């Protein structure tokens, strides 16, 4: 099948869903353009900052569009491109976008409270503590994985200490990234001083993007992975503590232009070349490497269709910057729809890169996507070096923009975990733990330690944990909508399905870990404990975490169900 046809069908479905279903949700729940948002009421210059709607959209999209939509869609294509396409469209429209929009809506209607605080209000303090602990651990794992990914992308040296073939390109992309950070601060100061917005802000952003690429391409920074790792953690520390307007928002705004150029390059490339989708339509309900389609397809596609992490961004940062309630639809629902389109593009690029017999292209999903889109740019006359640097930067930016968002959310989760209502008279140790700088430091140290001791041993659980997070958010939204007298029945199908998906995936993973450990013990204990110990390190951490996730998830679901039964319809005045 022609990949262009697939993209056009997806684009029509997604745009139609935003226009019809998204607006229906907004009308059903109620949007008040005259209401004062938390950003206006609680403006503090750091987290609560009234911001132009499109700038908030840029922040939301760049923060949620991490590695997931590209890697997930391409990896899940092992089941065939049709199941992936169907889940991305159905999941994005009826699951992911609804969850993101709902989380943003609930937070804005509750003074910008994060999801943890919303859970305390509608489900209880125990549920809140459990959820915040889960969020903080989740953020630590994501920080470790994405920081390692970014450092690896910019790394110029191989294991033997010699320069790798792509050293020049990697170093250039790294320098571009640093210049992005520098110019983001300059852009933030300009916006603050002159109150620029709209086309003026966009023109300045584009100029800074061009300057960043010119400087980076001509002055590559050749460093090893360890050095880039330190630079990455220093950056995300400042991104987590500095005011949103000074670094995070302007960087997201600039990055979004780059993402739009990447998406446009992919779309135009598919339009001009209209390559054939070489991946098979459907390979079966079981895959030798991945397992059964249910639930693996759903947890593998992850962010391209639905992601619990998105709700943390919606309620953790975006809700505190929305200037007008009318912007919530494009920020919450629209950003997710665009991410689903990105997942479809990644699927089509991978399909075009596959061999005629259906054999997938060699390399990681990021490498496949990067090479494919860079090839499209070269088709339009862009020099190979420039195209490769651009795509390397885009790939790293997908991880970086999520990384600085999750660092900030992790910091907030840690603060909320130990905070009390009367912080002014709280104990000294509690004030220390809730300090912005200390909580950020602890969060990043946790992530940094995971990069050193092997986060890869627990990373396979990321997909399940992420989807469990979305189910927990949906359960909270059901209670919120009920007590405020709003319709919540559209949340029931995604809630039930996501609970089935996540708990099935976790139980399957748990059983696989038990089997791997017991098999290794049976084979190696008579001869020695070396092999068994290695297997336990690789699988034991997953086993322990899987059990914790199941217990934690069931506990929160139980509290949510209990709260829902006790909650009276329309018992709380509509915000």
Model-derived regions, located:
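Extracellular/periplasmic helix-exit of transmembrane alpha-helices
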Residues: 101, 270-284, 334-372
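Membrane-helix boundary/coupling elements in multi-pass transport proteins
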Residues: 67-74, 91-99, 103, 107-111, ...
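Membrane-interface loop-to-helix entry segments
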Residues: 16-30, 134, 171-215, 225-272, ...
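Transmembrane helix-loop junctions in multi-pass membrane proteins
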Residues: 2, 69-70, 82, 141-163, ...
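Loop-to-transmembrane helix boundary motifs in multi-pass membrane proteins
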Residues: 125-140, 334-340, 387, 416-452
């Amino acid at each position: 099948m022609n990949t262009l046809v697939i993209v056009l069908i997806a684009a029509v479905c997604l745009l139609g869903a935003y226009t019809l279903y998204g607006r229906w949700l907004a009308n059903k729940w109620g949007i008040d353009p005259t209401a004062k948002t938390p950003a206006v009421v609680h403006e503090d210059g750091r987290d609560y900052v009234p911001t132009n709607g499109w700038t908030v959209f840029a922040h939301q999209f760049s923060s949620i569009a991490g590695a997931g939509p590209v890697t997930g869609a391409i990896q899940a294509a092992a089941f065939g491109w049709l199941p992936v396409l169907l889940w991305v469209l159905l999941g994005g429209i009826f699951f992911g976008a609804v969850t993101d929009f709902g989380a943003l809506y609930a937070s804005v209607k509750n003074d910008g409270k994060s999801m943890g605080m919303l859970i305390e209000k509608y489900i209880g303090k125990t549920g809140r503590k459990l959820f915040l602990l889960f969020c903080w651990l989740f953020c630590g794992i994501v920080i470790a994985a994405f920081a390692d990914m970014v450092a690896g992308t910019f790394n110029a040296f191989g294991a033997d200490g010699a320069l790798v073939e792509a050293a020049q390109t990697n170093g250039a992309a790294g320098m571009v990234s640093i210049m992005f950070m520098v110019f983001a601060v300059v852009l933030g100061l300009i916006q603050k001083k002159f109150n620029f917005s709209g086309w003026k802000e966009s023109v300045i952003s584009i100029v800074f993007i061009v300057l960043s690429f010119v400087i980076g391409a001509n002055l590559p920074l050749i460093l090893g992975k360890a050095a880039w790792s330190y630079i990455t953690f220093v950056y995300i520390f400042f991104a987590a503590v500095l005011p949103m307007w000074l670094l995070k928002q302007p960087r997201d705004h600039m990055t979004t232009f780059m993402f739009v150029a990447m998406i446009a390059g992919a779309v135009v490339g598919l339009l001009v070349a209209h390559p054939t989708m070489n991946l098979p339509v459907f390979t079966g309900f079981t895959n030798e490497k991945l397992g059964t389609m249910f639930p693996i397809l759903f947890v593998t596609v992850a962010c391209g269709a639905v992601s619990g992490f998105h709700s943390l961004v919606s309620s953790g940062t975006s809700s505190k910057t929305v200037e007008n309630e009318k912007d919530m639809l494009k920020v919450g629902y629209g950003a997710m729809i665009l991410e689903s389109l990105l997942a479809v593009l990644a699927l089509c690029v991978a399909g075009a890169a596959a061999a005629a017999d259906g054999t997938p292209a060699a390399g990681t999903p990021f490498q496949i996507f990067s090479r494919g889109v860079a090839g499209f740019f070269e088709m339009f006359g862009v020099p190979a070096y420039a195209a490769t640097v651009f795509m390397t930067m885009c790939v790293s930016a997908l991880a970086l923009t999520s990384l600085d968002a999750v660092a900030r959310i992790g910091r907030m989760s840690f603060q909320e975990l130990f905070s009390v209502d009367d912080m002014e008279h709280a104990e000294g140790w509690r004030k220390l733990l809730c300090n912005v700088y200390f909580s950020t430091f602890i969060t990043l140290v946790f992530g940094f330690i995971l990069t050193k001791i092997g986060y890869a041993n627990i990373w396979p659980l990321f997909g399940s944990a992420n989807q469990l997070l979305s189910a927990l958010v949906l359960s909270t939204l059901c209670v919120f909508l009920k007590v405020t007298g709003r319709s919540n029945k559209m949340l029931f199908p995604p809630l039930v399905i996501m609970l089935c998906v996540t708990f099935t995936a976790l139980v399957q993973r748990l059983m696989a870990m038990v089997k791997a450990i017991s098999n290794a013990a049976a084979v190696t204990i008579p001869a020695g404990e070396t092999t068994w110990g290695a297997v336990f390190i690789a699988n034991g951490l997953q086993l322990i975490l899987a059990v914790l996730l199941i217990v934690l998830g069931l506990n929160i679901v139980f509290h949510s169900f209990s709260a829902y039964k006790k909650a009276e319809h329309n018992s709380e005045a509509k915000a």
